[in-house]
Each structure stands twice: as structure tokens, then as C-alpha cells.
Amino acid sequence: MAKFFALKNFTALSDLHPNMANLKIIGIVIGKTDVKGFPDRKNIGSERYTFSFTIRDSPNHFVNVSSWGSEDYIRSLSDNFKVGECVIIENPLIQRKETEREERFSPATPSNYKLLLSENHSMVKVCSPYEVDTKLLSLIHLPVKESRDYYSLADIVANGHSLDGRIINVLAAVRSVGEPKYFTTSDRRKGQRCEVKLFDETEPSFTMTCWDNESILLAQSWMARETVIFASDVRINFNKFQNCMAATVISKTIITVNPDTPEANILLNFIRENKETSIADEIDSYLKESVNLNTIVNVYTVEQLKGKALENEGKVDPFYGILYAYISTLNIDDETTKVVRNRCSSCGYIVNDASNTCTICSKDSSRSRSFCLSFDVLVDLTDHTGTLRSCSLSGSVAEETLGCTINEFLTMTSEQKTKLKWQLLLERSKIYLKLILSHRARGGLKVTILSCKLADPIEASRDLAGQGHT
């Protein structure tokens, strides 16, 4: 039989005071930062390393724990445990917390104290979940903020710039978790980022970005349209590149996964009830960019877009623009060209035709996946200055452009498809575009069509005349 660690044998976080010695504390890790190095003022030319984490031993009590020391010690200690695990801390130093200064960058805690670990005197031991009281383990599903203290995603979008820079709480479901992307900054520091798409009853897609390894590691364990999170103290900003509001995980953030609250249970029920009935809508909103077209105002020619792409070389963020152009290639009546594809209901990516599996979700092959048909058309766009080749026209944008649904298209004869093609070819259109540099894309530029409608001749002449073109 497993040996249980009884809470009564440890000092409770609620009982902490500075004069205590030979402490032994048990708690569950609810937050953790990355290891960082800083110049050592006492030893010029060397560095000291640090990381911090937050532990909890009851619903109302949690504290921040910091450790400083050599790189080997700090990295070894940090690698020893992760968020969600239970730890025993022996002989920490209790310090009074400087609330205003410290909580600018650390999670806000109800305690007046913080714990400091010494390389020579303190010890941290990881407990097996079988050795821990279930009351302690259940704390991982309890948000650190009041369960109703959050913004809905629609409220964030509606408030827009008034929330720019604010730190708030968010309750949402996970729509998709992107692959971590790694980069090197101009001063040769290595970095990483991971985009998580969220949704709730009010908003189909909202971006949250993780920049640190610990939050990225946590996010990789989340299941699309099954996981609900309560993210306390995320920063909200207006993303000028994507023209929308977005959230960022910061050092103050604590994320509670599948919170045990009435509000989270309502959201979870919403997910389950809509999971099978709205697959088509779910897929479509993956393909739709969450960009307000009214915020895209810059008009370009093809030549100018290619020039701007060269100016942006080395940048990962997309740019947006309006193009007055003709669809010069539209192979929707060619039997050898596939324009309708299956997309995964979990992540929105194209399903491999040969294996009939999603390459993104294949790591969890034990789960059954639903697929949905979607337009996936590559078109060429041409104006008087040149041609953008292999531009992506997909989802509902494709349906609106073609003037038919997937099902209507699939019932068309080859002659009807050819007639539809010639109705669209060589008609000047007003096209909203998202462009991003990509070495995988043809010409090094990935172009996504956000909207494509027949241009008003007067509007087109006016806009192009403003650039010296007609």
C-alpha cells in the first residue's frame, strides 16, 4: 500500500512567518517560469541563474517560490518537476513580500510572504500522485481568481482598444494548439512562440500566444475542443499585424486547466453539445481569418506587394493589403486538380488523402476524428504590373467568391464548372489579402485571399488613381 503524506505533518502556507526554521512544506505546483541568467554583480564576468514557481496547499493559500544559484543547480532543479506535480520543500527561507514591486512580474498571491530556496540548505522533492492526499491534487483545477471574474472573448473583441495593455482573466475552450516555432533574435538570443486558438459561446476564434517554454509545454498537453482553461492575468493587446485583439501569457499568468467551476462546466457542456453538430462551422472559422476587413485600407499593385515582401525579409509577421486585379488562373473544371479537400475537425488542417489521417493530430491516433469537406483552391491574380501565383482561396471565402456551396459545386457537371470559371476569369475584383514570407511557398510568398468581390469601377479608378495608376 502506498504511503500517504498527511498534510498535518507539514507547515501550512497560512501559518508562515519570518522566524520559522527547519520548515517542511507540501504543495502542488500551479505555475512556473523559465530559467534565466543575469550578470553576477559580485563576480564580474559570471552569471547567476534563477527561476520561480508557485505552490498551493489549500483553496485560499498559495505562495511564490524563488531560487538563485549556479546554472547547473538551477537547471537541474527546474527540470525536476513541472506544473501539476506535488512537491515537498525543506528548509526554505521565508521573506516578507514587497507586494507592489514583485507582483508587477510575479503571480499575485494572498500571502504576505515568499519562499527563497538556498542551493546549500534547501531541498525540493517531487511526490508521486499516489502518495498525495486527493484534496491537494484537486487544487490544480481551482482557479486562483474568483470563478466569475473573467472577460468573455466577445467582450474583449467588443472593447477593443480600451483593453489594450490591460491584464485580465479569460475563461475559454481550446480550439487548436499550434506547433512551437523557434527563432533567433538580432542579438543572437534564442526564443520560441506558440499560438493557441481559443473560443467560447460568444466568439469562434481568439489568439493567445505563449512565449516561454513552460507555458508552451503546458499548452502541448491540451486537447482541441475538449480542454477548458481559466487564464488569470494574461495581457491583452491589439495585434496590429493581424488587426485584432489577442492575449499573451506573461510571467504573472497562472493557467488552470479544466477548472472545477460552474462557469467552466457550462462552457464544457457547450463544447460537447456543439462538437458533432457544427463541424462545418468549426472548420470554416479555422479558414476564416479573424481580421476586420475595414481595418485593411492600403491599396497595392502586384509589383508593390512583391517589393514590400522584399522589405519584410526576415520578418515572421504577416502584412495585409487591397489589390485590384483579375483572377487569371482558376482550375475548378480540371479533373486532375483537386479543389475540394477533407479537413480535420480537431485542428482544421488538410487530411492526408493516402492515409486518411490528419498529420497534425496523428500523434493521438487512438482518438476518432471527424472530417469536413472544404474548398481549397489555388488561383493566380494579375494586374497591369504582374501576377501573384498560387494564392489560397478556401473555406467560406471561396464559397462567396464562386457563388456556390460545396454541395452545389459537387453536383455540377464539367460544363457547368467551366461556365462558372469563365464568369469569374478576367473580371476586375477588389481583393483583400494576407501575405506572409514563407520559403515553402511558391515565389517565397504565401498569399491568402480574405475577400474577393467584383470591383466597383468608380471606386477602383479612384483608389488606383491615388497611386498614379488607372
Swiss-Prot record:
GO molecular function, one term: single-stranded DNA 3'-5' DNA exonuclease activity
InterPro entries referenced in this protein's UniProt entry, alphabetically: MEIOB, NA-bd_OB-fold, OB_MEIOB_N
Keyword Ion transport tagged: no
GO cellular component, one term: chromosome
Subcellular location: Cytoplasm; Nucleus; Chromosome
One Pfam family named in its UniProt record: OB_MEIOB_N
Main location: cytoplasm
DNA-binding region, residue range(s): 167-272
Disulfide bonds: none
Record note on quaternary structure: Component of a multiprotein complex with RPA2 and SPATA22. Interacts with SPATA22. Interacts with the complex BRME1:HSF2BP:BRCA2.
Function: Single-stranded DNA-binding protein required for homologous recombination in meiosis I. Required for double strand breaks (DSBs) repair and crossover formation and promotion of faithful and complete synapsis. Not required for the initial loading of recombinases but required to maintain a proper number of RAD51 and DMC1 foci after the zygotene stage. May act by ensuring the stabilization of recombinases, which is required for successful homology search and meiotic recombination. Displays Single-stranded DNA 3'-5' exonuclease activity in vitro.
Family indicated by similarity: Belongs to the MEIOB family.
Name of the protein in question: Meiosis-specific with OB domain-containing protein
Organism: Rattus norvegicus
